[in-house]
C-alpha cells in the first residue's frame, strides 16, 4: 500500500460535520468536539497565537442587538417603571 497520491483517492468518509454553535463544518463526529469554537465546552475556543481569528469573531463583528440596548439604557440610568407625569 502506498502512502502518497494513490491513497488520497480512497478518502471519502466525512470526519467533520456542521457545528450547532458556530455553524462551521468543524464538528468532529468521533471526538464530538468542534475544532473551531470548542463546542461542547462552555467557553469559546480562542488562542493568542491567532490574533486574526480573534478579530473575526470578537464582540462588535455581529449585530450586537443586546449590547446596543444595554448601552442605551445605561445612558439613561436604567430607568424603569411608568413614565413620570409632565407638570404644566
From Swiss-Prot:
Keywords: Metal-binding, Ribonucleoprotein, Ribosomal protein, RNA-binding, rRNA-binding, Zinc, Zinc-finger. Zn(2+) binds at residues 19, 22, 34, 37. One of its GO terms (molecular function) is rRNA binding. One of its GO terms (cellular component) is cytosolic large ribosomal subunit. Disulfide bonds: none annotated. InterPro entries: Ribosomal_eL37, Ribosomal_eL37/eL43, Ribosomal_eL37_CS, Ribosomal_zn-bd. Binds 1 zinc ion per subunit. Residues 9-24 have a biased composition (Basic residues). One of its GO terms (biological process) is translation. The keyword Magnesium does not apply. A zinc finger (C4-type) spans 19-37. It comes from the Eukaryota. Its cofactor is Zn(2+). It holds the Pfam family Ribosomal_L37e. The keyword Transmembrane helix does not apply. Residues 1-24 are annotated as: Disordered. Binds to the 23S rRNA. Belongs to the eukaryotic ribosomal protein eL37 family. This is Large ribosomal subunit protein eL37.
Amino acid at each position: 500500500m502506498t502512502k502518497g497520491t494513490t491513497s488520497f483517492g480512497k478518502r471519502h468518509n466525512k470526519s467533520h460535520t456542521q457545528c450547532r454553535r458556530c455553524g462551521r463544518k468543524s464538528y468532529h463526529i468521533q471526538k464530538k468536539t468542534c475544532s473551531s469554537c470548542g463546542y461542547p465546552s462552555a467557553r469559546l475556543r480562542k488562542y493568542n497565537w491567532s490574533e486574526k481569528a480573534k478579530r473575526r469573531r470578537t464582540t462588535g463583528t455581529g449585530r450586537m442587538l443586546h449590547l446596543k440596548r444595554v448601552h442605551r439604557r445605561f445612558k439613561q440610568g436604567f430607568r424603569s417603571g411608568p413614565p413620570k407625569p409632565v407638570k404644566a
